[in-house]
């Protein structure tokens, strides 16, 4: 027989539990191989109660800028202090540092290769360390799989409450790359740059709604094709026609 009282108690306890470990993963590993599963296994071996959320494992191989953008657009929607692991790491095994950092809303574990650039541009860095304390790594560290042997165990320990400062030596600066910015020409024309192309082929630009005055007189030009005005949805134009609109991230997009 179903026990309603027991069910209510379970929900209440779950809601009150503020110590649940929440960890996200973003990688370029794909899902055909064992890499993502191995990372999850390491995390669960340290914290069997951890909740692991996949943001994406379809980042183009070694595309640090794409990973930086994808994490930037996803992490604000997670609870504060979620630990976000980003492993797009063409320099694995080299002298590049492995780092963990705290920003205003979240914590991150990643290679120090610029993958945090968009996040830090939004909210800055409160604290950062180089992951030099091997106590929080796996006993044997592969030269080519720091995702499994350094980033995953560090994330699990961090989510369980190990202080950031205990993970390694403090850092005051980390690697970032210059972010594209829209350019406003003397005649009022705004020149934007493509930040990301999503899986539907939509172009996401660095231009935001506040960078120009909305109105029917807006003309956009892309690859020699002109778009008159802004739409609201994909169905505002016939099939095969381009439409420009403000997307869910607040950026100007072209579909």
Predicted features and spans:
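Anionic-ligand-binding alpha/beta catalytic cores of soluble enzymes and soluble regulatory domains
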Residues: 138-207, 211-214
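A conserved acidic, glycine/proline-rich C-terminal tail/linker
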Residues: 204-255
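N-terminal beta-loop-helix "entrance" segment that forms/cooperates
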Residues: 54-74
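Active-site histidine-anchored catalytic micro-motif
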Residues: 22, 46-52, 65-67, 78-81, ...
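N-terminal glycine-rich anion-binding loop in soluble enzyme alpha/beta folds
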Residues: 21-61
């Amino acid at each position: 027989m179903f026990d309603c009282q027991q069910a209510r108690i379970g929900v209440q306890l779950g809601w009150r539990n503020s110590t649940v470990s929440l960890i996200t993963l973003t990688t370029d590993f794909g899902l055909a191989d064992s890499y993502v599963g191995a990372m999850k296994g390491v995390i669960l071996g340290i914290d069997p109660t951890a909740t692991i959320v996949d943001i994406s494992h379809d980042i183009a191989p070694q595309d640090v800028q794409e990973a930086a953008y994808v994490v930037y657009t996803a992490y604000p929607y997670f609870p504060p202090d979620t630990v976000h692991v980003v492993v797009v790491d063409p320099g694995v095994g080299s002298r590049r540092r492995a780092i963990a950092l705290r920003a205003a809303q979240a914590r991150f574990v990643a290679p120090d290769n610029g993958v945090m650039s968009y996040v830090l541009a939004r909210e800055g860095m409160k604290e950062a360390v180089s992951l030099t304390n091997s106590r929080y790594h796996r006993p044997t560290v592969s030269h080519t799989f720091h995702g499994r042997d350094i980033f995953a165990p560090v994330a699990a320990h961090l989510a369980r409450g190990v202080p950031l400062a205990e993970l390694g030596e403090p850092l005051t600066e980390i690697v970032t790359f210059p972010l594209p910015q829209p350019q406003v020409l003397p005649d009022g024309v705004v020149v934007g740059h493509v930040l990301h192309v999503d899986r539907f082929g939509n172009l996401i630009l660095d231009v935001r709604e506040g960078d120009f005055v909305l109105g029917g007189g807006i003309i956009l030009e892309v690859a020699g094709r002109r778009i008159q005005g802004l739409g609201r949805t994909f169905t505002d134009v016939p099939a095969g026609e381009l439409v420009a609109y403000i997307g869910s991230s607040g950026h100007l997009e072209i579909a």
